């Protein structure tokens, strides 16, 4: 069965093209770009000892953050679900697409979205139990991609699934690391931005956005009349509030996907899709009405008929419907 809901804004851009644009702009501004240069944390006090500022944007496995856990007061929480980042030339051009498939071992699902004219990202996620049962741990990267292609064949229109993780040893599948830092600044001259400072689960698609907004905020404060130490503190104070808000939403969405088998088995299609659309709690019932009033009205009508049996009557908001606890109906 297919359900569609509109009104949800989305922008996709290929990572390669994105980096090309950033490189071109940096050169335009006179920045010296160095590639294939190994970096060690000790370089901060040796090679870069005369630098006024070192910006550590070295990602979720940040060497800088990991070298000073007591300074950055960082925690990394490894979540249980397994996922693998794949690509395909099936474009999914009309919408951000979620696909749920039940295998002999249990449920597995995909997050798919287009990022250029002929390519889409295709993230496959599942529970650790299904991951183990399907034998992904013992597969090569290519075998994993082919197994996923077979599972989702009905949605790929003959296209293959591509892997870009040859640099990863062992399984291409990973667990999501939820990174939190209480402090982003060291010695008033080293600062974390992006995934080095915080991560947000891929299901809300805000990781790159957060990193860019960090950079914009940092540049704004450095370009002000503030000293570098004061500018770094202003940047951290400003960004931590917004990052925490999005991390909370991402955490809600992440935990929802960790319980997909429970929801998909217990809910009917409309109720399951409503639960998925509101999973982050950024999208409330009434916010969903603003985004897609037709879909929400159909869902309210569906629940009204299911719980009250008044086919054709005006839909009742879900909060006013009766609730059944085992065999005991609770009249609202």
PLM region spans:
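Short acidic, glycine/proline-rich loop/turn micro-motifs
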Residues: 5-7, 132-136, 203-205
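C-terminal helical "tail/cap" subdomain of flavin- and related membrane-associated enzymes
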Residues: 220-332
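Conserved mid-domain beta->alpha element of the FAD-binding
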Residues: 55-56, 86, 172-252, 256-258
């Amino acid at each position: 069965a297919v359900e569609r809901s509109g009104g949800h804004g989305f922008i996709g851009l290929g990572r390669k093209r994105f980096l090309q644009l950033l490189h071109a702009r940096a050169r335009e501004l006179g920045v010296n770009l160095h590639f294939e240069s190994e970096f060690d944390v000790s370089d901060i006090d040796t090679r870069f000892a005369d630098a006024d500022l070192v910006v550590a944007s070295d990602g979720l496995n940040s060497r800088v953050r990991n070298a000073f856990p007591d300074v950055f007061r960082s925690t990394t929480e490894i979540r249980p679900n397994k996922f693998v980042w794949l690509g395909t030339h099936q474009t999914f051009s009309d919408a951000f697409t979620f696909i749920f498939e039940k295998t002999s071992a249990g449920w597995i699902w995909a997050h798919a979205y287009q990022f250029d004219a002929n390519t889409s990202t295709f993230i496959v996620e599942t529970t650790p139990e299904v991951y183990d049962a399907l034998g992904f741990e013992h597969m090569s990267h290519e075998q994993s991609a082919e197994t996923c292609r077979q599972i989702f064949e009905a949605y790929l229109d003959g296209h293959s699934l591509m892997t870009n993780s040859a640099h990863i040893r062992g399984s291409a599948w990973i667990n999501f690391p939820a990174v939190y830092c209480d402090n982003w600044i060291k010695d008033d001259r080293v600062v974390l931005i992006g995934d080095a400072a915080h991560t947000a689960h891929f299901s809300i698609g805000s990781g790159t956005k957060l990193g860019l907004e960090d950079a914009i905020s940092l540049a704004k404060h450095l370009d002000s009349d503030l000293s570098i130490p004061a500018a770094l503190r202003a940047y951290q104070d400003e960004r931590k509030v917004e990052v925490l808000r999005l991390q909370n939403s991402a955490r809600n969405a992440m935990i929802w996907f960790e319980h997909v088998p429970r929801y998909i088995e217990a809910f009917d299609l409309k109720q399951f899709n409503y639960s998925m659309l509101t999973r982050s709690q950024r999208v409330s019932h009434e916010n969903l009405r603003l985004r897609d009033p037709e879909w929400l009205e159909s869902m309210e009508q569906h629940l009204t008929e299911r719980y009250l049996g008044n086919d054709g009557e005006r839909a009742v908001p879900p909060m006013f419907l009766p609730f059944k606890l085992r065999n005991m109906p609770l009249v609202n």
